[in-house]
Amino acid sequence: MNQSLLVTKRDGRTERINLDKIHRVLDWAAEGLNNVSVSQVELRSHIQFYDGIKTSDIHETIIKAAADLISRDAPDYQYLAARLAIFHLRKKAFGQFEPPALYHHVVKMVELGKYDNHLLEDYTEEEFKQMDSFIVHDRDMTFSYAAVKQLEGKYLVQNRVTGEIYESAQFLYILVAACLFSNYPRETRLDYVKRFYDAVSTFKISLPTPIMSGVRTPTRQFSSCVLIECGDSLDSINATSSAIVKYVSQRAGIGINAGRIRALGSPIRGGEAFHTGCIPFYKHFQTAVKSCSQGGVRGGAATLFYPMWHLEVESLLVLKNNRGVEGNRVRHMDYGVQINKLMYTRLLKGGDITLFSPSDVPGLYDAFFADQDEFERLYVKYEHDDSIRKQRVKAVELFSLMMQERASTGRIYIQNVDHCNTHSPFDPVVAPVRQSNLCLEIALPTKPLNDVNDENGEIALCTLSAFNLGAIKTLDELEELAILAVRALDALLDYQDYPIPAAKRGAMGRRTLGIGVINFAYWLAKNGKRYSDGSANNLTHKTFEAIQYYLLKASNELAKEQGACPWFNETTYAKGILPIDTYKKDLDAIVNEPLHYDWEQLRESIKTHGLRNSTLSALMPSETSSQISNATNGIEPPRGYVSIKASKDGILRQVVPDYEHLKDAYELLWEMPNNDGYLQLVGIMQKFIDQSISANTNYDPSRFPSGKVPMQQLLKDLLTAYKFGVKTLYYQNTRDGAEDAQDDLAPSIQDDGCESGACKI
């Protein structure tokens, strides 16, 4: 290697290249790692050096050389590359490897307008010194390379135009903790700050993108998911569109319920005009969604919901596909089709489904969610009423069209609205659930807005986080983690701003949280269980019972301290009804694990003191934030032992946790023979989870004789999901040959899954 090359330092000076210094940094980064070669990294990077190269480019070249060596046989390169990247990041942020004192850092960032000045108003210099003593900067060295790149690309406070970085990861974690507990009493708050900091910086609790990138900055909107219901009037349609623009500009993913909009050809003002139907208004919503990127962190994204019996359903089901022309397609949103038992019954009995415009059938739309018996009574009545415009379609044809579009686009989702209301924390008579969100894990009440400042409307918000099952040894640890997650997210509701009154009203009234899990596949592998063979059923029951029990207990304790949420009376919890009372009893045939916790005592305590939060759990996708914790995505099986994730920061390789010891214990996605075992597990989780679950269905066409997935199989899985009480289905993934070119490398759903959506974490 040419020792006489000149390099350009960060301050502009030039000097001869110092290969010893590079070697020392690499030796430091490789310490304690297995099966990594410093000379390999040096060889790969040296050939890319040139005269006059900047020292920062040398650093980036070495990092890239190490990252390119990450493989199934040498997974530790992900830590070597990460340590080098952390070194580089700290140099960029602080001009040196050693981080500055926390207090001085915060003062400087507040002066620059990067941090919220409330930090200096709420805490004294002395308290910052104490917080500084809580920080363990060496925890930066536990990140994988994929995690560091995600931090750099999405989470660390930075100037997105110039690329300047202003902080390191441990400052992010301690300051999120400081912001969230700033209103707690002075004598207890630093204890909570320390406990929360320890939980998030050791990856036991995983936080969503809006919290990681936003808390501590002057922008205060951190709810990941926003659910907006639209009424059947121009005023409401415009109010919905304004609300969408406000929220996509602030990092949120959107669920839109457009099911009330009347069908094409309906009379307006008693026949004075002829209605243009749903599609022009869906286009209007699509334009609103795409008008802003989510705070520079990701592009806007939405899922729009409508009932299966809508008169225009056959035109709506095809809106996403590649056929058709611009005029009859609205491709840049995803869609959720709403179904109930009556629709499934018609399918099973070979009957018809009758389609109506919601505007022609008084009471039917509301009953679809609030009262299944009343819905059936009205539906049959209107079917026999010759004065009402309608269309009959064979149920099997309509379901087949829906499943064909789900198969070809992967992005037609399913919401079983009866399960969402019968096994719900809300009383459907007063607070029916009429939609879900972008990624199908949220089930909350909404009311249409007539204008953006409508006091009577209700926009639902959900604030997310997750427990990392891979980072805990026993389920008992969940008790402390539940206390921290519930208290932090509950405090966030008071800490954040609400751009629209209808959102503030709902958030303050219901105080809804959605706490889920990541790293479930690792949890199964560690416990020697598999998705597909039933061996995980009892463990899953035990795990999710513990999660929901400890979350309810934490919210009940918080209610004793700070009062129940104001609209607690609209929940089923207020009547002493718990998830263990309303689950789908078909599950009892596939799981025989008894209940392990004292639910009766909890029931009494909830009836007496209430809950601080109307909902506590939801199982969301976690494509991005699971990379920070080096965890598997949500509840999903991994696609490969090494996954390749494309993000705007380039290709990131990530190896499944503890690969060397557990490689034979993991069950990969395409090794599962069918969806049955997975759907059973989702049903068992749904027994306890009070909101919903982003559950996917997966198909490998090569497993079928014709090389195509038969419609019969798609419908069978849809009915299996319904039978086990599954509320929602998210993606449908179809295996194509491309991802098998290298058997250990699996591209994950690209990181714009959910268009890199916000209701993931």
Swiss-Prot record:
The record marks 225, 462 as: Important for hydrogen atom transfer. DTTP binds at residues 232-234, 262, 269. It comes from the Bacteria. Gene3D superfamilies: 1.10.1650.20, 3.20.70.20. Its EC number is 1.17.4.1. The record marks 730-731 as: Important for electron transfer. The active site is at 437 (proton acceptor), 439 (cysteine radical intermediate), 441 (proton acceptor). Keywords: Allosteric enzyme, ATP-binding, Deoxyribonucleotide synthesis, Disulfide bond, Nucleotide-binding, Oxidoreductase. GDP binds at residues 209, 437, 441, 623-625. Provides the precursors necessary for DNA synthesis. Catalyzes the biosynthesis of deoxyribonucleotides from the corresponding ribonucleotides. R1 contains the binding sites for both substrates and allosteric effectors and carries out the actual reduction of the ribonucleotide. S.typhimurium produces two separate class I enzymes. This one is the functional enzyme during growth. This is Ribonucleoside-diphosphate reductase 1 subunit alpha. It comes from Salmonella typhimurium (strain LT2 / SGSC1412 / ATCC 700720). The gene is nrdA.
